[in-house]
């Protein structure tokens, strides 16, 4: 109880308070941390409902208090009622409050899946409590694949559509103009929670194999737009790679725009890498992590119940050079027709495109 109270007070103190009532608009975007809808809808047609403590509207909160309504759901509903939108949108499919908004406000909701799902969500009662389908509802849900559709149809009522990655569908690469270079998508983390266990080891073996095959080796840093953490990330890899790599530091381009210029993409686990695979790029997944690692369930194919090892992926608890070589060689050396034939099933299993 005290922990929750402390968190609540910290939340209130950290937030930016605004007195001006939210702008009446066509759309309310729940969570302004990510907005892929901007490609379709003009920025001025959105009013953002912040939910991470970035901003609290004093007038909306005061209205809730006058009505003796004290929950987060009440605040969200009061905010939306004032804006009076035609549609409520979100790009975060794991925010459970969103699934109560349609019935609470009488306004239609649309959710898109942002990232790959894992079995951790399936097993956790935090996301979807028992019998959640009785009180969770979304009017429209745009999802990656049939496996995710089946999962959500058991947890939520609504209409579900398999479209692949919403944002990825806007970025189709010209495969004939791609550089024949290797890019490793970094999952570096400055936190001491073990998430980036062996990220540097995987990068090291990939760099050695790239060098052996006369291919340039690059790393797409996770924190290229955060200079403070970026320096730590570069140091992390430099300790083992000794500057034998290139950090891709273009801040103006999105990760999608950067990666579509490269032919060979590798990662330990990454929604971005799966999206590259769906678009026709060569993608390989090499995870070397203990089963106790908090991201172990993020391995390629985990949610889709694929084996731990396959043509272009492997999941290891310790270094296995032969396995790393096998995955690398399949991604790099398989001819085009065979690659398309062998990966077709797995592309559809993970992503529509």
Across the structure, where does each feature detected by a protein language model lie?
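Short hydrophobic segments within beta-strands
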Residues: 29-31, 112, 163, 184-185, ...
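Conserved catalytic-core segment of nucleotide-activated headgroup transferases in glycan assembly
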Residues: 40-44, 165-237
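A donor-sugar binding/catalytic signature common to diverse glycosyltransferases
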Residues: 90-93, 113, 152-153, 252-298
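Active-site and donor-binding regions of nucleotide-sugar-utilizing enzymes
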Residues: 4-19, 27-169, 272-273
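Nucleotide-activated donor-binding/catalytic signature segment of Leloir-type glycosyltransferases, i.e.
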Residues: 234-251
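Catalytic binding pocket for nucleotide-activated donors in carbohydrate/polymer assembly enzymes
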Residues: 138, 156, 271-346
């Amino acid at each position: 109880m005290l922990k929750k109270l402390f968190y609540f007070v910290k939340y209130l103190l950290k937030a930016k308070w605004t007195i001006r009532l939210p702008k009446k608009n066509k759309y309310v975007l729940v969570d302004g941390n990510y907005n892929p809808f901007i490609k379709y809808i003009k920025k001025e047609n959105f009013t953002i409902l912040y939910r991470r403590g970035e901003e609290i509207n004093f007038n909306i909160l005061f209205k809730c208090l006058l009505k003796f309504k004290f929950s987060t759901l009440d605040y969200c509903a009061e905010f939306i009622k004032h804006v009076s939108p035609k549609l409520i949108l979100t790009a975060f499919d794991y925010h459970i409050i969103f699934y109560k908004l349609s019935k609470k406000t009488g306004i239609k909701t649309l959710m898109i899946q942002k990232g790959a799902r894992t079995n951790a969500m399936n097993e956790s009662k935090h996301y979807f409590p028992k019998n959640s389908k009785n009180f969770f509802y979304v009017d429209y849900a745009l999802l990656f694949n049939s496996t995710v559709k089946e999962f959500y149809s058991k947890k939520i009522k609504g209409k579900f559509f398999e479209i692949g990655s919403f944002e990825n569908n806007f970025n189709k690469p010209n495969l004939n103009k791609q550089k024949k270079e290797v890019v490793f998508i970094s999952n570096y983390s400055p936190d001491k929670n073990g998430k980036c266990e062996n990220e540097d080891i995987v990068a090291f073996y990939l760099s050695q194999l790239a060098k052996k095959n006369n291919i340039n080796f690059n790393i797409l840093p996770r924190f290229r737009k955060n200079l403070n953490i970026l320096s730590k990330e570069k140091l992390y890899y430099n300790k083992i790679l000794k500057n034998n790599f290139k950090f891709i530091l273009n801040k103006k381009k999105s990760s999608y725009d950067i990666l579509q210029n490269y032919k060979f993409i590798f990662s330990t686990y990454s929604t971005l890498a799966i999206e590259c695979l769906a678009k026709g790029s060569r993608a390989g997944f090499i995870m070397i992590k203990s089963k106790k690692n908090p991201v172990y369930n993020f391995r390629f194919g985990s949610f889709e119940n694929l084996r731990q090892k396959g043509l272009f992926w492997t999941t290891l608890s310790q270094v296995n050079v032969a396995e790393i070589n096998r995955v690398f060689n399949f991604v790099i050396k398989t001819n085009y027709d065979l690659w398309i034939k062998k990966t077709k099933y797995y592309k559809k299993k993970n992503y529509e495109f």
